[in-house]
Curated annotation (Swiss-Prot):
GO terms for molecular function: amino acid binding; ornithine carbamoyltransferase activity. Keywords: Arginine metabolism, Cytoplasm, Transferase. Reversibly catalyzes the transfer of the carbamoyl group from carbamoyl phosphate (CP) to the N(epsilon) atom of ornithine (ORN) to produce L-citrulline. GO terms for biological process: arginine biosynthetic process via ornithine; arginine catabolic process to ornithine; citrulline biosynthetic process. It is found in: Cytoplasm. L-ornithine binds at residues 175, 239, 243-244. This is Ornithine carbamoyltransferase, catabolic. Belongs to the aspartate/ornithine carbamoyltransferase superfamily. OTCase family. It comes from Treponema denticola (strain ATCC 35405 / DSM 14222 / CIP 103919 / JCM 8153 / KCTC 15104). GO terms for cellular component: cytoplasm.
Length: 338
Protein backbone atom coordinates (compact mmCIF):
# COMPACT_ATOMS: atom_id res chain seq x y z
CA UNK A 1 0.00 0.00 0.00
CA UNK A 2 2.89 2.40 0.69
CA UNK A 3 4.13 2.07 -2.86
CA UNK A 4 0.60 2.40 -4.18
CA UNK A 5 -0.23 5.55 -2.24
CA UNK A 6 2.90 7.32 -3.45
CA UNK A 7 1.74 6.92 -7.04
CA UNK A 8 3.54 7.40 -10.34
CA UNK A 9 4.31 11.08 -9.66
CA UNK A 10 6.24 10.26 -6.45
CA UNK A 11 9.07 12.59 -5.42
CA UNK A 12 11.46 12.24 -2.49
CA UNK A 13 10.57 15.07 -0.08
CA UNK A 14 11.79 13.33 3.08
CA UNK A 15 13.27 15.82 5.55
CA UNK A 16 12.06 18.86 3.59
CA UNK A 17 10.23 21.74 5.25
CA UNK A 18 7.07 23.19 3.70
CA UNK A 19 7.45 26.95 4.12
CA UNK A 20 6.32 28.44 0.79
CA UNK A 21 5.46 27.13 -2.66
CA UNK A 22 8.37 29.04 -4.17
CA UNK A 23 10.57 26.30 -2.68
CA UNK A 24 8.82 23.52 -4.64
CA UNK A 25 8.81 22.57 -8.30
CA UNK A 26 5.67 22.02 -10.35
CA UNK A 27 6.33 18.26 -10.30
CA UNK A 28 6.71 18.25 -6.51
CA UNK A 29 3.42 20.11 -6.09
CA UNK A 30 1.80 17.65 -8.49
CA UNK A 31 3.03 14.77 -6.32
CA UNK A 32 1.54 16.36 -3.19
CA UNK A 33 -1.80 16.83 -4.94
CA UNK A 34 -1.85 13.23 -6.18
CA UNK A 35 -0.91 12.00 -2.72
CA UNK A 36 -3.72 14.11 -1.23
CA UNK A 37 -6.24 12.47 -3.56
CA UNK A 38 -5.05 9.03 -2.48
CA UNK A 39 -5.34 9.89 1.20
CA UNK A 40 -8.80 11.36 0.63
CA UNK A 41 -9.94 8.14 -1.05
CA UNK A 42 -8.55 6.07 1.82
CA UNK A 43 -10.20 8.28 4.44
CA UNK A 44 -13.58 8.02 2.74
CA UNK A 45 -13.23 4.26 2.30
CA UNK A 46 -12.37 3.84 5.98
CA UNK A 47 -8.97 2.32 5.19
CA UNK A 48 -6.50 2.81 8.09
CA UNK A 49 -3.29 4.63 7.12
CA UNK A 50 -1.21 4.92 10.27
CA UNK A 51 2.03 5.10 8.31
CA UNK A 52 3.73 7.41 10.83
CA UNK A 53 2.95 5.37 13.94
CA UNK A 54 5.27 6.23 16.81
CA UNK A 55 6.17 9.70 15.57
CA UNK A 56 5.21 12.93 17.33
CA UNK A 57 4.52 16.46 16.09
CA UNK A 58 4.01 19.81 17.80
CA UNK A 59 1.71 22.58 16.61
CA UNK A 60 2.85 26.12 17.50
CA UNK A 61 0.03 28.66 17.20
CA UNK A 62 0.54 32.40 17.65
CA UNK A 63 -2.65 33.03 15.64
CA UNK A 64 -5.87 31.19 16.36
CA UNK A 65 -7.46 28.92 13.78
CA UNK A 66 -10.25 26.43 13.25
CA UNK A 67 -9.39 24.75 9.96
CA UNK A 68 -5.59 24.70 10.30
CA UNK A 69 -5.54 23.30 13.82
CA UNK A 70 -8.23 20.69 13.18
CA UNK A 71 -6.62 19.65 9.89
CA UNK A 72 -3.19 19.09 11.44
CA UNK A 73 -4.60 17.31 14.49
CA UNK A 74 -6.92 14.94 12.60
CA UNK A 75 -4.32 14.30 9.88
CA UNK A 76 -1.71 13.58 12.55
CA UNK A 77 -3.97 11.15 14.41
CA UNK A 78 -4.99 9.42 11.17
CA UNK A 79 -1.30 8.86 10.40
CA UNK A 80 -0.79 7.36 13.86
CA UNK A 81 1.15 10.24 15.41
CA UNK A 82 1.06 11.91 18.79
CA UNK A 83 0.08 15.59 18.54
CA UNK A 84 0.91 18.41 20.98
CA UNK A 85 -0.77 21.82 20.66
CA UNK A 86 0.95 24.92 22.06
CA UNK A 87 -0.78 28.30 22.07
CA UNK A 88 1.01 31.63 22.78
CA UNK A 89 0.59 31.11 26.53
CA UNK A 90 2.05 27.60 26.49
CA UNK A 91 5.62 28.26 25.39
CA UNK A 92 8.51 30.62 26.07
CA UNK A 93 9.35 30.99 22.37
CA UNK A 94 10.57 34.47 21.59
CA UNK A 95 9.84 35.72 25.11
CA UNK A 96 12.11 33.98 27.59
CA UNK A 97 13.79 31.72 25.06
CA UNK A 98 15.14 32.53 21.61
CA UNK A 99 13.54 31.04 18.50
CA UNK A 100 16.81 29.25 17.75
CA UNK A 101 16.92 27.60 21.18
CA UNK A 102 13.24 26.66 21.08
CA UNK A 103 13.75 25.11 17.65
CA UNK A 104 16.66 22.99 18.87
CA UNK A 105 14.73 21.80 21.93
CA UNK A 106 11.60 20.88 19.96
CA UNK A 107 13.70 19.21 17.29
CA UNK A 108 15.08 16.83 19.93
CA UNK A 109 11.59 15.88 21.14
CA UNK A 110 9.43 15.95 18.03
CA UNK A 111 9.62 14.58 14.50
CA UNK A 112 7.91 17.58 12.91
CA UNK A 113 6.84 21.13 13.78
CA UNK A 114 3.92 23.22 12.52
CA UNK A 115 3.95 27.00 13.00
CA UNK A 116 1.08 29.44 12.50
CA UNK A 117 1.77 33.05 13.31
CA UNK A 118 3.05 36.37 12.05
CA UNK A 119 6.65 36.11 10.92
CA UNK A 120 7.88 34.28 7.84
CA UNK A 121 11.40 34.81 9.18
CA UNK A 122 10.43 32.97 12.37
CA UNK A 123 9.18 29.86 10.56
CA UNK A 124 12.32 29.91 8.39
CA UNK A 125 14.42 30.03 11.57
CA UNK A 126 12.54 27.09 13.06
CA UNK A 127 13.31 25.10 9.93
CA UNK A 128 16.97 26.08 9.97
CA UNK A 129 17.64 25.15 13.59
CA UNK A 130 15.23 22.34 14.49
CA UNK A 131 16.65 19.59 12.28
CA UNK A 132 13.14 18.26 11.52
CA UNK A 133 10.51 19.16 8.90
CA UNK A 134 8.70 22.42 9.65
CA UNK A 135 5.34 23.26 8.07
CA UNK A 136 4.01 26.78 7.59
CA UNK A 137 0.40 26.91 8.79
CA UNK A 138 0.24 30.63 7.92
CA UNK A 139 2.45 33.69 8.22
CA UNK A 140 1.92 37.31 7.22
CA UNK A 141 3.59 36.57 3.87
CA UNK A 142 2.46 33.09 2.84
CA UNK A 143 -0.17 30.41 3.45
CA UNK A 144 1.13 27.36 1.52
CA UNK A 145 -1.00 24.62 3.09
CA UNK A 146 -4.14 26.52 2.08
CA UNK A 147 -2.87 26.61 -1.50
CA UNK A 148 -2.68 22.85 -1.82
CA UNK A 149 -6.29 22.58 -0.65
CA UNK A 150 -7.32 25.25 -3.16
CA UNK A 151 -5.54 23.55 -6.06
CA UNK A 152 -6.98 20.16 -5.14
CA UNK A 153 -10.50 21.61 -4.98
CA UNK A 154 -10.16 23.32 -8.36
CA UNK A 155 -8.80 20.18 -9.97
CA UNK A 156 -11.64 18.11 -8.51
CA UNK A 157 -14.18 20.42 -10.14
CA UNK A 158 -12.54 20.89 -13.55
CA UNK A 159 -10.37 17.79 -13.91
CA UNK A 160 -7.25 19.84 -14.65
CA UNK A 161 -5.40 23.03 -13.66
CA UNK A 162 -3.21 24.18 -16.55
CA UNK A 163 -4.80 26.95 -18.59
CA UNK A 164 -7.59 27.80 -16.14
CA UNK A 165 -8.32 31.48 -15.46
CA UNK A 166 -8.18 32.36 -11.77
CA UNK A 167 -9.23 35.74 -10.35
CA UNK A 168 -8.55 36.92 -6.81
CA UNK A 169 -10.75 39.84 -5.70
CA UNK A 170 -9.93 42.04 -2.71
CA UNK A 171 -6.69 42.83 -0.89
CA UNK A 172 -4.19 41.33 -3.33
CA UNK A 173 -1.14 42.09 -1.21
CA UNK A 174 -2.08 39.76 1.66
CA UNK A 175 -0.63 36.33 2.43
CA UNK A 176 -3.40 34.40 0.68
CA UNK A 177 -3.18 36.43 -2.53
CA UNK A 178 0.63 36.19 -2.52
CA UNK A 179 0.44 32.43 -2.19
CA UNK A 180 -2.34 32.04 -4.76
CA UNK A 181 -0.37 33.95 -7.37
CA UNK A 182 2.60 31.62 -6.94
CA UNK A 183 0.42 28.49 -6.76
CA UNK A 184 -1.40 29.38 -9.98
CA UNK A 185 1.67 30.12 -12.07
CA UNK A 186 3.46 27.03 -10.75
CA UNK A 187 0.63 24.97 -12.24
CA UNK A 188 0.40 26.89 -15.52
CA UNK A 189 -2.76 28.81 -14.63
CA UNK A 190 -3.65 32.40 -15.54
CA UNK A 191 -3.75 34.49 -12.34
CA UNK A 192 -5.50 37.87 -12.14
CA UNK A 193 -5.37 40.14 -9.10
CA UNK A 194 -8.45 42.38 -9.18
CA UNK A 195 -8.04 45.08 -6.55
CA UNK A 196 -7.22 48.76 -5.94
CA UNK A 197 -3.81 49.55 -7.38
CA UNK A 198 -2.10 50.22 -4.06
CA UNK A 199 -3.26 46.80 -2.84
CA UNK A 200 -1.56 44.95 -5.71
CA UNK A 201 1.09 42.35 -4.75
CA UNK A 202 4.64 43.68 -4.39
CA UNK A 203 6.61 44.29 -7.57
CA UNK A 204 9.30 41.80 -6.52
CA UNK A 205 6.82 38.96 -6.01
CA UNK A 206 5.00 39.77 -9.24
CA UNK A 207 8.32 39.66 -11.10
CA UNK A 208 9.10 36.27 -9.54
CA UNK A 209 5.65 34.97 -10.48
CA UNK A 210 5.99 36.17 -14.07
CA UNK A 211 9.36 34.44 -14.33
CA UNK A 212 7.75 31.16 -13.25
CA UNK A 213 4.78 31.73 -15.58
CA UNK A 214 7.12 32.08 -18.54
CA UNK A 215 8.28 28.51 -17.89
CA UNK A 216 4.89 26.92 -17.16
CA UNK A 217 2.64 28.66 -19.68
CA UNK A 218 0.76 30.62 -17.03
CA UNK A 219 0.38 34.38 -16.72
CA UNK A 220 -0.07 37.21 -14.22
CA UNK A 221 -2.45 40.14 -14.70
CA UNK A 222 -3.10 43.04 -12.33
CA UNK A 223 -6.23 45.14 -12.81
CA UNK A 224 -8.46 47.58 -10.94
CA UNK A 225 -11.34 46.90 -13.34
CA UNK A 226 -13.83 44.37 -11.95
CA UNK A 227 -15.47 43.69 -15.31
CA UNK A 228 -12.13 42.98 -16.98
CA UNK A 229 -10.81 41.01 -14.03
CA UNK A 230 -13.76 38.64 -13.74
CA UNK A 231 -14.60 38.17 -17.42
CA UNK A 232 -14.40 34.50 -18.37
CA UNK A 233 -12.75 33.47 -15.09
CA UNK A 234 -13.08 29.82 -14.10
CA UNK A 235 -12.43 30.58 -10.43
CA UNK A 236 -13.35 33.63 -8.33
CA UNK A 237 -11.63 33.75 -4.95
CA UNK A 238 -11.75 36.22 -2.09
CA UNK A 239 -10.72 36.57 1.54
CA UNK A 240 -11.83 38.74 4.45
CA UNK A 241 -10.93 42.40 3.95
CA UNK A 242 -8.97 42.82 7.18
CA UNK A 243 -6.27 40.26 7.94
CA UNK A 244 -5.74 38.57 11.28
CA UNK A 245 -3.89 40.81 13.72
CA UNK A 246 -4.85 44.08 12.04
CA UNK A 247 -6.62 46.64 14.32
CA UNK A 248 -10.35 47.41 14.06
CA UNK A 249 -9.44 50.95 12.98
CA UNK A 250 -8.49 49.52 9.58
CA UNK A 251 -12.05 48.40 8.81
CA UNK A 252 -13.48 51.76 7.68
CA UNK A 253 -10.68 52.45 5.20
CA UNK A 254 -10.65 48.87 3.89
CA UNK A 255 -14.43 48.71 3.41
CA UNK A 256 -14.39 51.95 1.43
CA UNK A 257 -11.57 50.64 -0.77
CA UNK A 258 -12.80 47.10 -1.30
CA UNK A 259 -16.58 47.35 -1.46
CA UNK A 260 -16.46 47.54 -5.30
CA UNK A 261 -14.52 44.23 -5.26
CA UNK A 262 -17.17 42.22 -3.44
CA UNK A 263 -17.88 38.85 -5.06
CA UNK A 264 -21.56 39.10 -5.98
CA UNK A 265 -23.96 37.70 -8.56
CA UNK A 266 -22.84 40.22 -11.19
CA UNK A 267 -19.22 39.11 -10.79
CA UNK A 268 -20.16 35.43 -11.00
CA UNK A 269 -22.37 36.06 -14.04
CA UNK A 270 -19.45 37.79 -15.78
CA UNK A 271 -17.20 34.79 -15.14
CA UNK A 272 -17.24 31.53 -17.09
CA UNK A 273 -20.61 29.73 -17.10
CA UNK A 274 -19.04 26.88 -15.10
CA UNK A 275 -17.13 29.17 -12.72
CA UNK A 276 -16.73 28.23 -9.07
CA UNK A 277 -16.31 30.36 -5.95
CA UNK A 278 -13.60 29.73 -3.34
CA UNK A 279 -12.86 31.34 0.03
CA UNK A 280 -10.30 30.22 2.62
CA UNK A 281 -12.72 31.11 5.48
CA UNK A 282 -13.88 32.48 7.82
CA UNK A 283 -16.23 34.69 5.82
CA UNK A 284 -18.47 37.66 6.60
CA UNK A 285 -21.31 36.76 4.25
CA UNK A 286 -24.21 37.23 6.69
CA UNK A 287 -25.08 38.56 10.15
CA UNK A 288 -24.63 35.30 12.08
CA UNK A 289 -21.38 36.38 13.78
CA UNK A 290 -20.86 39.04 16.43
CA UNK A 291 -18.20 40.69 14.25
CA UNK A 292 -20.54 40.74 11.27
CA UNK A 293 -23.24 42.35 13.40
CA UNK A 294 -20.78 44.98 14.67
CA UNK A 295 -19.70 45.84 11.13
CA UNK A 296 -23.30 46.07 9.91
CA UNK A 297 -24.26 48.31 12.83
CA UNK A 298 -21.34 50.64 12.17
CA UNK A 299 -21.21 50.64 8.36
CA UNK A 300 -24.62 49.36 7.25
CA UNK A 301 -23.03 46.44 5.43
CA UNK A 302 -24.78 43.08 6.04
CA UNK A 303 -22.47 41.25 3.61
CA UNK A 304 -18.82 42.00 3.03
CA UNK A 305 -16.30 40.30 0.75
CA UNK A 306 -18.94 37.95 -0.70
CA UNK A 307 -22.72 38.07 -0.77
CA UNK A 308 -24.68 35.36 0.97
CA UNK A 309 -26.33 34.60 -2.37
CA UNK A 310 -22.99 33.59 -3.89
CA UNK A 311 -21.66 31.92 -0.74
CA UNK A 312 -24.68 29.62 -0.48
CA UNK A 313 -25.00 29.01 -4.22
CA UNK A 314 -24.20 25.81 -6.11
CA UNK A 315 -21.10 27.55 -7.49
CA UNK A 316 -19.61 27.83 -4.01
CA UNK A 317 -17.26 24.98 -3.11
CA UNK A 318 -15.89 26.49 0.10
CA UNK A 319 -16.70 23.48 2.28
CA UNK A 320 -15.09 21.04 -0.14
CA UNK A 321 -12.11 23.40 0.02
CA UNK A 322 -12.16 23.38 3.84
CA UNK A 323 -12.26 19.58 3.97
CA UNK A 324 -9.35 19.40 1.57
CA UNK A 325 -7.16 21.23 4.08
CA UNK A 326 -7.00 17.98 6.06
CA UNK A 327 -6.18 15.72 3.13
CA UNK A 328 -3.48 18.00 1.72
CA UNK A 329 -1.87 18.63 5.10
CA UNK A 330 -1.80 14.87 5.63
CA UNK A 331 0.01 14.51 2.32
CA UNK A 332 2.59 17.16 3.26
CA UNK A 333 3.36 15.54 6.61
CA UNK A 334 3.58 12.05 5.14
CA UNK A 335 5.77 13.12 2.22
CA UNK A 336 8.23 15.02 4.40
CA UNK A 337 8.43 12.50 7.25
CA UNK A 338 8.25 8.99 5.83
Amino acid sequence: MLKEIRGKSAKNLRGRSFLKLLDFTTDEIRYLLDLSKNFKDMKRAGIPHRYLEGKNIVLLFEKTSTRTRCSFEVAGYDLGMGVTYLDPNSSQMGHKESIEDTARVLGRMYDGIEYRGFSQELVETLAEYSGVPVWNGLTDLFHPTQMLADLLTIEEKFGYLKGLKFTYMGDARNNVANSLMIACVKMGMHFTACSPKHLFPTEDLVAEAKKIAAQTGGSVTLTENVSEGTKGAHVLYTDIWVSMGEPDSVWEERIKLLKPYQVNKAAMDNADKDAIFLHCLPSFHDLKTTKGQEINKKFGLPEMEVTNEVFESHKSVVFDEAENRMHTIKAVMYATMC
